[in-house]
């Protein structure tokens, strides 16, 4: 799993170009088939790193009635977001329950999924307080400050011990 995540992080930026579209990113309107009705759903179809802000409106195929937005955490401060049309849905959005705070600290690799059937309903992800996310990301670096202090104190004690002998 770690090897797959490493390969994704290293190789993904090299292969991505605007001309290199996956089958899900291609516009179904470009196909030869024109006998489909007008009741197909419109969704955003795109992938981004570390943000839910991507737009690429596409009309889904008639066999794909759902818009999906999914986020997968690869490293503690690195996640991939995919928006696409889908034939099935693992989790349907129900009437909004009480608002809950969105946490990025959970040790789960898959941390957000939303399915819906309304035009462009997969535009926005969960409400993330960017300052809280940055504080969480910065706390990793702050914990290393104690390590440098310990190393400095160790070197000072060694130097003091050598000067006494």
UniProtKB/Swiss-Prot annotation:
Tissues of expression: Specifically expressed in testis (at protein level).
Annotated signal sequence range: 1-17
Main location (coarse class): secreted
Superkingdom field: Eukaryota
Gene Ontology terms describing biological process: binding of sperm to zona pellucida
Subcellular location: Secreted; Cytoplasm; Cell membrane; Cytoplasmic vesicle, Secretory vesicle, Acrosome
InterPro entries: Snake_toxin-like_sf, Sperm-ZP_regulatory, Toxin/TOLIP
Membrane topology: Lipid-anchor; GPI-anchor
Keywords: Cell membrane, Cytoplasm, Cytoplasmic vesicle, Glycoprotein, GPI-anchor, Lipoprotein, Membrane, Secreted, Signal
Glycosylation site residues: 20
Lipidation (GPI-anchor amidated glycine): 138
Removed propeptide positions: 139-165
Pfam families, A to Z: Toxin_TOLIP
Domain UPAR/Ly6, residue spans: 47-141
GO cellular component: acrosomal vesicle; extracellular region; membrane raft; plasma membrane; side of membrane
Subunit relationships: Interacts with TEX101.
Function statement: Required for sperm migration into the oviduct and male fertility by controlling binding of sperm to zona pellucida. May play a role in cell growth.
Name of the protein: Lymphocyte antigen 6K
Gene: LY6K
């Amino acid at each position: 799993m770690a090897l797959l995540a490493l390969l994704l992080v290293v190789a993904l930026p090299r292969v991505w170009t605007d001309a290199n579209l996956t089958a899900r990113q291609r516009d179904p309107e470009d196909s030869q088939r024109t006998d489909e009705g007008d009741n197909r759903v419109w969704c955003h179809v795109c992938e981004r790193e570390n943000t839910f802000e991507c737009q690429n409106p596409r009309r889904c195929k008639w066999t794909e009635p759902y818009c999906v937005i999914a986020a997968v955490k690869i490293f503690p401060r690195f996640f991939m977001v995919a928006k696409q049309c889908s034939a099935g849905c693992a989790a349907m959005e129900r009437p909004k329950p009480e608002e809950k705070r969105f946490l990025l600290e959970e040790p789960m690799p898959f941390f957000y999924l939303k399915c819906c059937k309304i035009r462009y309903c997969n535009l926005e992800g969960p409400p993330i307080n960017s300052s809280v996310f940055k504080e969480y990301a910065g706390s990793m670096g702050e914990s290393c400050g104690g390590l440098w202090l310990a190393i400095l104190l160790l070197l000072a004690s060694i130097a003091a011990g050598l000067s006494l002998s």
